[in-house]
């Protein structure tokens, strides 16, 4: 059972050609057949089928279907859903169940979405390969010896393998966009504050955003329109109006579009295949009438350095709550309270999470706060100012999503600094809080996906999705098999 996007599925459901029960049963069978790929941490078999029957009955009663009627959706395992296990792919949250729904979950349920399961991820969203998961890595859909990217690797693989039509992810420094690039799908990080973070387990609160992974821009835009908007439970969510994203996309023309091409995004160290494929996509936009404008932006290396100081500092505070006292894993061999805290965290957290907690604690310590944390905040301000200036000259900023194609499982695990560079082109948008999207534009010489990365000004998701749709159409990348 295959569909040409959600509109195809919706029309077949509303015409009576298919039922939600048939569709969800088919998706669940495919999920079960892919169990060895470790894509899902939990599959909602009974819940999804019950929901499908409920929606079929709703349609039979003549009630109006919701905007997302019957859409099979996967949820990253760090977004709360009442009554469902929530682990963040970490041993320390073993056995924990959400006691409330995230705002995005409530809004999607209200529009008749169907959740098929939770997806694997890097532990607490810390990683770029999905290898930092307590339940093991996820293979890339195009080469099972390689990574799908991270930290939303399970969500990306679910969409690429057609196990969900859309998946929710979280993006702190590229965790939606980078795996989307590695898996040949769309990966959208909205403007900071566009989507409520209520119910998202915090990694770095001033960076975290819930994002979307989808096979095409239309499906991403549809879901974005449902989940975007102010939320009383999240003080950082924005009052900015939520437009009709499909209409905004339709008004976007490539002809006359000013595309900013930063020198910093095409360094000599960029993988030759990646550079060639991304530049070919840029050329197609130019041939369609776009104007290419070379612009100067701060070197991305500075963004990476500032980013890993700031996010680890925030993580060291946010993850202090996981101590074995109230929920999750508790070390069985602890003679006193202090030992219980130490042992539970030592045994419950993985190596990368512990590395980042220690780094964050260090940069916030009295003797180093000014040298590291304060300086990183100053660098963040410089990036914000420079990007605002850039958008006085251009409509969109263009570059590669990743400096290299999907790498082998295990290849970078012993070199965390090299792993961190996987996000070198995605981190700047997170530093400044602007919306960004990864768009599939082709394949390298080994047949591995390559993504292009677009950044737009604050709250210009509609324009960005319209440009991305043009680019994806021009490049006509093949679907995953």
UniProtKB/Swiss-Prot annotation:
Sorted alphabetically, which keywords does the UniProt record give?
ATP-binding, Ligase, Nucleotide-binding, Protein biosynthesis
Looking up Pfam families in the UniProt record yields:
Amidase
Write the signal peptide boundaries. none
Q: A cellular component term (GO) from this record? A: glutamyl-tRNA(Gln) amidotransferase complex
Give coiled-coil spans as residue ranges. Answer: none
Instruction: Quote the catalytic residue positions.
Output: 76 (charge relay system), 151 (charge relay system), 175 (acyl-ester intermediate)
* UniProt-listed Enzyme Commission number(s): 6.3.5.7
Note the subunit structure: Heterotrimer of A, B and C subunits.
Q: What does this protein do?
A: Allows the formation of correctly charged Gln-tRNA(Gln) through the transamidation of misacylated Glu-tRNA(Gln) in organisms which lack glutaminyl-tRNA synthetase. The reaction takes place in the presence of glutamine and ATP through an activated gamma-phospho-Glu-tRNA(Gln).
What name does the UniProt record give this protein? Glutamyl-tRNA(Gln) amidotransferase subunit A
Write down the species.
Chlorobaculum tepidum (strain ATCC 49652 / DSM 12025 / NBRC 103806 / TLS)
Gene coding for it: gatA
